């Protein structure tokens, strides 16, 4: 089975709302902690200032952040000025039983400068498509003041309870130890709901490891599509993803926080780098490698049920809807470039597996 992994949740829902959290300015105030904590919070604030603007400035800044890919006009902003940089993420040409086709790409929701300009195979797929299909379009939400205000409210407990009352002592202790590697004290997070704590830690990890959600593949393509006037199709929605994240049970977050036991900042960064390396080479199976008995040591039967529930909600239930959306688009003969998180394509119950079971053929695109 697959236990709960922080890096897995990072690149499905949580990473997609990193920009939302940053634009809220709601990384916890660590003024009560040591200087390292202050430095971590300052880093987040600085990054927010660099990447969060308003109106037209927001779109231009996002594209310009990717080297050699700034938008100069409304024509095709994903240029042919590509380079051989060893980036070959998994991409497929999918054909329906009726003969309609679609190009599907596995994305990574936060990337580094080295990934840009994009490989020619990706730029061609984008430029040749009439529609860009993505998990959700967060570009307008980041500029919606009312939405952001409501999001901030949902990050905090409003019933006079605190974090320590919603998770076990074991989870609290593991989280406290892990926060120490960031120079933070758990007392700074007591007023935050588990989803906000989890997403804040993801944000800090992304930034400390020199990744940038503004340079994430789907965010880059979204920004470009808006500049080009290309039609955007949301497979899910911002509300759907936020509600999923917010409504996970305390039991799921308790197990998630307990998984920090024995982890350090460096070990989490290495896990992130390992997934990034796998993504760059098109190795999607690494995203869903099964855990061995040693790695599952300490998991009770109840823990395994909780992990299964999490993985079903986070991946497999969504995969079914994503595959259906792809089938619907192909049945209409739409010319679509379909881009969702790489983990959604992997293994049994992944998008490719589901499509093949429905009679579709999937051929890996060679770079």
Regions inferred by a protein language model and the residue ranges of each:
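Bacterial lipoprotein signal-peptidase II cleavage site
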Residues: 22-33, 37-49
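A cross-kingdom marker for long, charged
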Residues: 303-367
């Amino acid at each position: 089975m697959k236990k709960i992994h922080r890096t897995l949740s990072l690149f499905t829902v949580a990473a997609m709302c990193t920009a939302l959290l940053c634009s809220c300015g709601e990384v916890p105030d660590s003024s009560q902690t040591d200087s390292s904590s202050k430095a971590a919070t300052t880093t987040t604030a600085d990054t927010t200032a660099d990447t969060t603007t308003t109106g037209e400035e927001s779109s231009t800044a996002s594209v310009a952040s990717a080297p050699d890919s700034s938008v100069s006009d409304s024509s095709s902003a994903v240029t042919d000025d590509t380079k051989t940089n060893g980036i070959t993420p998994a991409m497929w040409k999918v054909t329906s039983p009726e003969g309609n086709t679609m190009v599907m790409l596995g994305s990574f929701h936060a990337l580094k400068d080295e990934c840009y300009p994009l490989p020619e195979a990706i730029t061609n797929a984008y430029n040749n498509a009439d529609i860009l299909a993505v998990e959700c379009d967060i570009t307008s939400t980041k500029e919606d003041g009312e939405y952001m205000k409501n999001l901030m409210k949902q990050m905090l407990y409003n019933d006079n309870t605190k974090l320590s009352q919603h998770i076990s002592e074991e989870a609290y202790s593991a989280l406290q130890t892990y926060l120490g590697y960031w120079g933070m004290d758990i007392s700074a997070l007591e007023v935050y709901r588990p989803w906000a704590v989890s997403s804040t830690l993801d944000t800090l990890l992304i930034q400390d490891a020199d990744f940038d959600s503004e340079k994430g593949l789907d965010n880059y393509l979204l920004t470009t599509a808006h500049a080009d006037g290309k039609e955007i199709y949301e497979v899910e929605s911002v509300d759907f993803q936020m509600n999923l994240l917010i409504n996970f049970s305390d039991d799921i977050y308790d197990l998630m926080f307990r998984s920090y036991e024995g982890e350090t900042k460096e070990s989490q960064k290495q896990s992130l780098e390992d997934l990034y390396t796998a993504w760059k080479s098109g190795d999607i199976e690494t995203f869903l490698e099964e855990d061995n008995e040693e790695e599952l040591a300490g998991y009770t039967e109840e823990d395994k049920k909780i992990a299964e529930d999490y993985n079903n909600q986070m991946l497999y239930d969504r995969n079914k809807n994503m595959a259906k959306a792809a089938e619907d688009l192909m049945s209409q003969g739409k010319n679509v470039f379909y881009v969702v998180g790489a983990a959604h394509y992997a293994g049994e119950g992944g998008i490719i597996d589901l499509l093949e079971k429905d009679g579709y053929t999937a051929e890996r695109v060679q770079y």
